[in-house]
């Protein structure tokens, strides 16, 4: 029979008495280091924007029906701080859901231009991204909305599920959180909209195609420039039976 005064039982009793007692009031400190939160202007600005995205819903086909399911209580669309707006001047997120035709293209571009900066675009569904099934034989469907306006996030599917829309919103929030106020100067006007000016650098070609112009692989090895290493095994140095067309 175990001893009732063992240290383990005593510790359990002390813990029970301490947990059943009244909770003491936390000590309020006046130390400045414990009452100040240090952050940057970029983090504060991005936190305010990513927590209150106001989307403009541009639905033209069946993908918009899946988006309408988010407005119900099952998926709780409002928990991300998204407030649908009916005016492009009050929105900073444009969600294009459905097929875009040549006739609707000017209206879509006009809505995008009326949105204030900074603004973002989500392409929802296969018809919005590539034209979908209408791109095969239709002469009026736009083969990708990115030919009209810049797209920040592509959401494939026919149609995408409501969970995919949540995933797209979360990824867009991460993108907004990584932005900097200093990078706004990189946005320049190209064509009819503002986008990031990509600085492309031309690099040296790695595949020159000399092996296609040589009659044999031995000739290609002899014609190789100085410093370029080629395979020198027996299979490579065997002359080809047929001449390679240039």
Swiss-Prot record:
Enzyme class: translocase
InterPro entries to which the protein is assigned, alphabetical: NADH_UbQ_OxRdtase-like_20kDa, NADH_UQ_OxRdtase_20Kd_su
Gene3D superfamilies linked to this entry: 3.40.50.12280
GO MF annotations in UniProt: 4 iron, 4 sulfur cluster binding; iron ion binding; NADH dehydrogenase (ubiquinone) activity; quinone binding
Main location: membrane
EC number: 7.1.1.-
Membrane topology classification: Peripheral membrane protein
Keywords: 4Fe-4S, Iron, Iron-sulfur, Membrane, Metal-binding, NAD, NADP, Plastoquinone, Quinone, Thylakoid, Translocase, Transport
Cellular compartments annotated: Cellular thylakoid membrane
UniProt cofactor note: Binds 1 [4Fe-4S] cluster.
Biological processes annotated in GO: aerobic respiration; electron transport coupled proton transport; photosynthesis, light reaction
Reactions catalysed: a plastoquinone + NADH + (n+1) H(+)(in) = a plastoquinol + NAD(+) + n H(+)(out); a plastoquinone + NADPH + (n+1) H(+)(in) = a plastoquinol + NADP(+) + n H(+)(out)
Entry's family note: Belongs to the complex I 20 kDa subunit family.
Stated name of the protein: NAD(P)H-quinone oxidoreductase subunit K
The organism of origin for this protein: Parasynechococcus marenigrum (strain WH8102)
Lineage: Bacteria, Bacillati, Cyanobacteriota, Cyanophyceae, Synechococcales
């Amino acid at each position: 029979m175990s001893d009732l005064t063992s240290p383990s039982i005593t510790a359990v009793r002390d813990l029970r008495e301490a947990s059943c007692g009244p909770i003491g009031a936390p000590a309020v400190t006046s130390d400045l280091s414990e009452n100040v939160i240090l952050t940057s202007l970029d983090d504060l600005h991005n936190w305010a924007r990513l927590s209150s995205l106001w989307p403009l819903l541009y639905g033209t086909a069946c993908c918009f029906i899946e988006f309408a399911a988010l407005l119900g209580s099952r998926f709780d669309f409002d928990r991300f701080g998204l407030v649908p707006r009916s005016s492009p001047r009050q929105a900073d997120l444009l969600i294009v859901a459905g097929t875009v035709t040549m006739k609707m293209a000017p209206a879509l571009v006009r809505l995008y231009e009326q949105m204030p900066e900074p603004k973002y675009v989500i392409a929802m569904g296969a018809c919005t991204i590539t034209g979908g099934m209408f791109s095969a034989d239709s002469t009026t469907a736009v083969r990708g909305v990115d030919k009209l306006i810049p797209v920040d996030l592509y959401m494939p599917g026919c149609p995408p599920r409501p969970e995919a829309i949540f995933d797209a919103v979360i990824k867009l929030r991460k993108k907004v959180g990584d932005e900097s106020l200093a990078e706004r100067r990189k946005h320049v006007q190209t064509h009819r909209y503002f986008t990031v000016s990509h600085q492309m650098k031309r690099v040296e070609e790695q595949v020159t195609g000399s092996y296609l112009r040589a009659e044999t692989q031995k000739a290609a090895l002899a014609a190789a420039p100085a410093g370029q290493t080629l395979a020198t095994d027996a299979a490579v140095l065997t002359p080809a039976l047929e001449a390679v067309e240039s």
